[in-house]
Amino acid sequence: MFLQEISNVQRVLVFGDSTIENKLPVIRALWKASESSLLLKTFLQQAIEIIQEETQKLASQEGSLFLHCINVLEIAEIYAEAEEPDEIIASVLALVARFGALVLDNEHNDGSRQSTGPIQIAGFCTGLLAGAVAACAKDIITIFDLTCEVLAISFRLVIALVRRSKAIEPEPGLWATTFIRVSRQELEMQLEDYNLYHNLPREKQAYIGVTSQLWNTVFAPPSVIQHMSESCPIFSQMSQVSTTAAMAVHASHLSLPDIDWIIGSLPGLNTPVLPDRSIISTSTGKPFLAATLQELLESIIADISMNLLDIDSTVQGICLQLDMARPVVISAMGPSPNIPALTRELANGGFKSKTLAVISGDRPRRLLPQARSRP
């Protein structure tokens, strides 16, 4: 049933981050869907051209794989066999998946937006970038144009964040691990003691980048993550899950990337944020205050690169924007592990909700870094 057949509903669009799934199944699902969607097929063709054009502008070998592939499916197939995580490839594939899901969703439901009323948008980490397009695009043509422009911006943001991380520690490896069933306050105290005891310089210190009531994700250079997880008695005894992030994000102690270079001067930047759209900041749990796409992207880049991602406040912020008297449809723009938290919060608040998967994919693959020396 398409959404135009559902009366009086409130929509919540959810865009997950780049760590949430093996990229190949979701790209394959999009590729299959494009066989019956000319617009999605055109977007996927445009996506590889944009990625290759942006790659050619780089002076280094960053993203060189993109220049040797004829489409995003080939990129995903090659990356699925990779032994080491590559944040540029992983993030770009995840972004293509989110933008592609948005194109597909709007192609199916074009012309029905007025019947569904206000739309709430939740994006987690780089998922916010696709959410920005959803907040500004009033029709399928605008969706298509803005996805292409913001994909280029997103590519440059990933390059900037990877460069910032490699300037701290150039060796490949994972920059994060997630601790289960430990409070943020307790973990912060342990991290402060750890950083002080090992006399780590500010840029190499371990920090909490993502927090929730049930788990917290700690970021640090790969050598530090390796030592904490395997050789430090306090942390190695804690329940933890390897997290597929290969760059530092949500890092308030690091320098802000060059926003002017990242955003550039594309024509769609002056597109206004639509009055019936609300996109939640993952650091404040409140709607971003932005009049245009450019202003929104500037705030989103700060949330991704500098600000703590608070899962619980984001989910609560979404629920505060909703009318309890009306049913809720959650549109999953690809897999997101945070949808169960949202559905629980809605149920606790007395909402009736249903989740529809626009596109689906596998659960995360677990990549383990190679053994490295102690910091």
PLM segments and residue spans:
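Acyltransferase/transacylase module recognition
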Residues: M1-P118, S252, L256, D260-P375
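Residue-level signal for helical boundary/lining positions with a hydrophobic bias
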Residues: L13, I121-G123, A246
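Beta-strand segments within the central parallel beta-sheet cores of soluble alpha/beta enzyme folds
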Residues: G117-G123, T147-V150
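Gly/Ala-rich beta-loop-alpha elbow adjacent to hydrolase catalytic centers
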Residues: R98, I119-G127, G131
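Alpha/beta catalytic cores of group-transfer enzymes, especially the acyltransferase/condensing modules
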Residues: A134-E295
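Short glycine-enriched nucleophile-adjacent loop
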Residues: A101-L102, L128-D139
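Beta-strand elements of modular eukaryotic interaction domains
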Residues: E84-P85, I121, G131-A134, Y207-I208
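Conserved SAM-binding loop
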Residues: A122-G123, T217-V218, A332
